[in-house]
Curated annotation (Swiss-Prot):
Pfam families: Ribosomal_S17. It comes from Paracoccus denitrificans (strain Pd 1222). This is Small ribosomal subunit protein uS17. Belongs to the universal ribosomal protein uS17 family. GO terms for molecular function: rRNA binding; structural constituent of ribosome. PANTHER family: 40S RIBOSOMAL PROTEIN S11 FAMILY MEMBER (PTHR10744), SMALL RIBOSOMAL SUBUNIT PROTEIN US17M (PTHR10744:SF1).
Length: 82
């Protein structure tokens, strides 16, 4: 089974070797047909403590590292400003 890759923004880097990433998804409401935004926070492993608050990163699913960490930071993505 392939590993999931998500993209989100770092909202906390206070813990050692851990960042909290806010991932937002958009979907169409089945009844109202309106675009709805939903967000979820994931705790990801950052071995070198290189990512700071506000960075946009990609995280990949991995084996459990601790009680709450099941994701690892893959890379930092450059935001495209339109």
């Amino acid at each position: 089974m392939p590993k999931r890759i998500l993209q989100g923004k770092v909202v906390s880097d206070k813990n050692e070797q851990t960042v909290t990433v806010l991932v937002e998804r958009r979907f169409k409401h089945p009844l109202l047909h309106k675009t709805v935004r939903s967000s979820k926070k994931y705790r990801a492993h950052d071995a070198d403590n290189q990512f700071k608050v506000g960075d946009t990163v990609r995280i990949v699913e991995c084996a459990p590292i601790s009680k709450t960490k099941r994701w690892t930071v893959l890379t930092e993505t450059a935001e495209v400003s339109a």
